[in-house]
Amino acid sequence: MSHTAEIIAVGTELLLGNITNTNASEISRALSAVGVNVFWHTVVGDNPERLREALKIARKRADVILTTGGLGPTYDDLTKQTVCETFGKPLVLREDVLEHIRTYFARNVHLVMPENNRQQAEFPADCVIFDNPVGTAPGCAFEAEGVHVLMLPGPPFEMRTMLQNWAIPYLRGLSKEVIVSHDIMTFGLGESPMEDLMRERISQMENPSPVSYTHLTLPTT
């Protein structure tokens, strides 16, 4: 069975345009390689009400929801709390993760762990923990009412490491299907004549989703 996914990026800095949402494109490519169709990208600020609304919409139309961001130690990092409220899951403290965060601070920062980092060791009950070897924000995944929810950190390097090491193996276990994608690169042709050339071939494909896009390269002086 194929799965449909929605990626929800959490962070007011994304909406303000201070940071480009590169995570979404990277996650989409990785999910398509394991047969998960990404149908929606959503961006919400660090606001629990708007995130809750986005999650309620996503759970009605997708069976995989993947969030990035909002797993830090500050007051506006509310992804786990909001996800748990939306799906009726209690937050529980994982002592093993708390000890891991304390050790990370001692070894890498040479400081005692600040108390507000304690919330990074709280997780939905009965979830799978995704270790974070390059930061203090572990991710996690759980299934509720037929929907798989995965939460990854926002910083791209941390997200990428966790995506490759944990999220993709988790999703690969859900389905044996794959999405086959081919790129055809041309030059000197506009989109309209290219469509005429490809129409017959596309009509012979099974369940195709053709997409065209153009790129203009200006001569340099």
Language-model features: locations:
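Short amphipathic alpha-helix segments
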Residues: 189-207
